[in-house]
């Protein structure tokens, strides 16, 4: 882009004086790519030309300017103005102001309501850019260059509120919900078990490490800070690119400024599955159990496959991954809805799905909570994620299907292994087939024999499909027909491998004799990219 600035002819007087005699005009051949900031006190520059949304920053940072134009941030002012519900206090989050950056006092639009400050521009997150454009080559110092923060909690000197300044509150509680979610607590694998400093865990438990693992090279305020006090959870900017969305195969940007797609059934490319796929099959050289196998489970490719395992791949792979649920994980775990007063219809609150709970318990005002102890009934929880695609007709139907699936999983897993003393070790104090197998020589639970025995494979699947640490976490609901197919095959293999095991309980035998759940076949949204289920 050409910019016109003043160019003066200057030369050595002895050589140029004859040429310049009588010459007093000045020709305009360039223009400085910077306008004086409307709010000179803060140094917020804003738009270079507001009519075509050319930011001052974008005169040099061309790639970021181009990507930003495709975001909702670039139309934030017009969106608010055209909403019919704009209030004066709303504009600071739809313009360049002190919201979203480290500027403490009212600045930008809050100080000077100029069109140069319309929309959520670069400086909304980075802070004032005037010092940087005046001294772009100056050694790095506080505020120059102005770096945005990836942290959002604002609970330390190195964590500004950034996104939280605007993406919070009753109408858009993204950070309010996120702060209660497991993504905010990712530094610990479970309460008291800190894992963010473990190199093998950090890329999925610490925000900066995740960005590095995904090849993000953009600089930000916390990037070079070391020490556990500067660790970040899975904050907004880990999943969302503030500069603009990644592109689909056809060149169009992804929705929501996401770094990776959420609708691709490939565990290595799907945003959620980049972490939720760590260990979904047993390791013949170690006794480690499953760890975050949700992605492969959803796609129909998780678990130990007993000998001859060859289920109806269409059924097990398409349970929650069919064309009716194109957003896959996010289709159930990121569900937005508005709560209104039942008597008047007036707005009360909004949920934006950033607790990442598919069927959360409801508080007295109808807003989801992090409580996981309420009943699995149509009234105690919200089932909107289950009913919105039309797969489950209403909340009562969805709750009944969920309860039935969990009961079948409980019956099958306890028949295989009931860890009565809750020590996660198969021993003779437990119940189920594995408690009988553990007493049979030679030992069937050796991590050093280079094989996965039928007993070890069954143990892996039970660990994966029960609500236990590291497992699928849904009691098989991510893919109930794959879960049931695996457990039924485990039981058959155990009976064939270890003669003398007792007869099955009556209701388990009934499950074994019946069809594989109430399978309703639907076509996959696209062919599986991950490895299909095959017999071993």
Where are these regions (language model features)?
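Sec-dependent bacterial lipoprotein signal peptides
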Residues: 1-21
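Short sequence/structural segments immediately N-terminal
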Residues: 23-308, 319-347, 356, 360-363, ...
